């Protein structure tokens, strides 16, 4: 606990804001080009082959981004849109690829939570 005199001399320091997605530079999304598309294994206790892509952004940063949903059409040189949001069981993955935007196609046969996966509304019979 500081004394009044110490507060008069120094004052209180406000905590510096630290972004969880620094490569976006305060933008909601950023465009980038896939350099590598691969699978990655999660931390314990989970087990899977998670689909990730290494993406070079327009601002020069290179980040690892998660490809959500079942199946994807991404390969090297695909142009993708990146948003913030980490994947808890993949260390170092702090970004998500936006499905249904640019070269990333939406998830096929998706009925629920369609807007999150860029899936069109199915035709009514």
UniProtKB/Swiss-Prot annotation:
Gene Ontology MF, one: rRNA binding
GO biological process: translation
Residues recorded with modification 3-methylthioaspartic acid: 89
Keywords of this entry: Methylation, Ribonucleoprotein, Ribosomal protein, RNA-binding, rRNA-binding, tRNA-binding
Domain of life where this protein originates: Bacteria
UniProt key word Amino-acid biosynthesis: no
Keyword Ribosomal protein: yes
InterPro entries documented for this protein: NA-bd_OB-fold, Ribosomal_uS12, Ribosomal_uS12_bac
Annotated Gene Ontology cellular component terms: small ribosomal subunit
Subunit note: Part of the 30S ribosomal subunit. Contacts proteins S8 and S17. May interact with IF1 in the 30S initiation complex.
Record function comment: With S4 and S5 plays an important role in translational accuracy. Interacts with and stabilizes bases of the 16S rRNA that are involved in tRNA selection in the A site and with the mRNA backbone. Located at the interface of the 30S and 50S subunits, it traverses the body of the 30S subunit contacting proteins on the other side and probably holding the rRNA structure together. The combined cluster of proteins S8, S12 and S17 appears to hold together the shoulder and platform of the 30S subunit.
Family that this chain belongs to: Belongs to the universal ribosomal protein uS12 family.
NCBIfam families (UniProt xref): rpsL_bact
Name the UniProt record assigns to this protein: Small ribosomal subunit protein uS12
